[in-house]
């Protein structure tokens, strides 16, 4: 167990979780009642198996913890809780945090600098979040810090490090890699044309395959209308991997909303 040199608050395991309130966020509104029930069951197991640790004065409560657990379990709704094996703690800062980052250049020199991070997924360790950005994960904007870090964990199940290719059948690897790199190139072309700030997909997706998979996983669950029509082949691969189709959920929800409005006239 990691020992941290500052006082931390851990969420207790005997909470009466406010699931109805926790589900009441735009990210989860399109789930069916059956999906919500299964998501709650997974989230309860998640909270039994993982420690949520609040750092640097941040305070956890039952609603925050329940929402964090629900979002953690959304990507593995159809995969199973065992896909989140391999870590035991979620560390939560109140805001983006500073870490020492090291890298090796082309001639073998090691450089170090302090950088600000929103979150991290360690290969053999915890997921680290910050609450400021986690709150922005509740909407349907395409940004979701929790799903981003979970995607890295799912990616790392396929090897020692994140590669952008999760654990999929070997016969599908070449096609996945081709479609992922095509998406990266397309995103980079848009960045070159309009700039990072105006790009319709987070520019971080163009940096490397692992980040592309993580960023597009954010869009897959929280903004499918931006992902599916732009990269239809890759979208289908994501649907096959996650065994979910958020775009279909969106269409069904919209149709039910239209029907409800017509019934009121």
Curated annotation (Swiss-Prot):
One of its GO terms (molecular function) is metallopeptidase activity. It comes from the Bacteria. Its EC number is 3.4.11.-. Its cofactor is Zn(2+). Binds 1 zinc ion per subunit. One of its GO terms (biological process) is proteolysis. It is found in: Cytoplasm. Keywords: Aminopeptidase, Cytoplasm, Hydrolase, Metal-binding, Metalloprotease, Protease, Zinc. GO terms for cellular component: cytosol. InterPro entries: MetalloPept_cat_dom_sf (IPR024079), MtfA_enterob (IPR057256), MtfA_fam (IPR010384), MtfA_N (IPR042252). Pfam families: Peptidase_M90 (PF06167). Zn(2+) binds at residues 111, 148, 152, 211. The keyword Protease applies. Belongs to the MtfA family. Interacts with Mlc. Involved in the modulation of the activity of the glucose-phosphotransferase system (glucose-PTS). Interacts with the transcriptional repressor Mlc, preventing its interaction with DNA and leading to the modulation of expression of genes regulated by Mlc, including ptsG, which encodes the PTS system glucose-specific EIICB component. This is Mlc titration factor A. It comes from Salmonella typhi. The gene is mtfA.
